[in-house]
Amino acid sequence: MKELCIYSSFTLLEFSMNKKKVITFLSLIVVTLCAIAGCISPSIELANTPSVTNVKQESVQLIVSAAADLNYVFPEIAKLWEQETKHQVTFNFGSTGQLAQQIDRGAPVDLFAAANKKFVEELDKKGLIFSDTKALYGVGRITLWQKEGSTLEIKDIKDLIKPEIKRVAIANPDHAPYGVATREAMQSVGIWEALQSKLVFGENIKQTQQYAETGNVDLAIVALSLSVNKSGKWTLIPSELHKPLEQMLAIPKSSPHPDVAKKLAAFINGEKGRLLMRKYGFILAGEKPTS
């Protein structure tokens, strides 16, 4: 029995040692093959590195409510931003007052670009926007605009009282900042009351221009940003005739994507955005009107 036990113990020990040798040998083969194939270092990196799925940020669709005077410039800015970020932007253009009402009612807007900072400030007082996102992005100007081919000789806002001018379109001053500026300019030169029978109101500054484009009115007072880089004739109205159209943007608290919206806002006020804003006639921070 004793010999049997000793034999059995040695047999088990020998088997165990042989098994360890086999495992060790096989392990060496695997390690050697991995080293040859160059898979050791990458395997370590993959173990410690988050997957591509976790790192890559999903593209989102931003909803931007913007004043109608931005109808041309903002899509150009958004196109550049989309190319750089792969995010998408959908615009809701309209009069600032009406857009502010939509946000007041809880519309899921990612970025609000107003034609007058007053509307942003009012939303801020109601606690409806992130206060730290408020930023001026430009100062607007107004022009006397006629469609291409018009034979009217208009060199000054006072010329609007001429009898040959029958109808003049302006943005509704009840909710459109550019309409307010137009009324102020007319009041400054003393023609507001005299023009009442001639005035046709557009819901926003873009619709106001369309009235003149289609010939429904003789001319329109519109944003400079809708006059430049476009066919038609226009005359700049002196900025001292009305209060500055200080335009402000902010991110509403109803925004589904506030972090991404902040990046778009920064892009608008960044180098590329400012270049395009200047192209469309906006006065930027630190600049003064030419006339």
Per-region residue spans from a language model:
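Sec-dependent N-terminal signal peptides of Gram-positive bacterial secreted proteins and lipoproteins
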Residues: 22-42
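Positively charged n-region of N-terminal signal peptides that target proteins for export
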Residues: 2-3, 17-21
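Intrinsically disordered, low-complexity segments enriched in serine/proline and basic residues
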Residues: 1-12
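Serine residues within intrinsically disordered or low-complexity segments
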Residues: 8-9, 16, 51
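Exported/periplasmic ABC-transporter solute-binding proteins
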Residues: 35, 39-84, 97, 101-105, ...
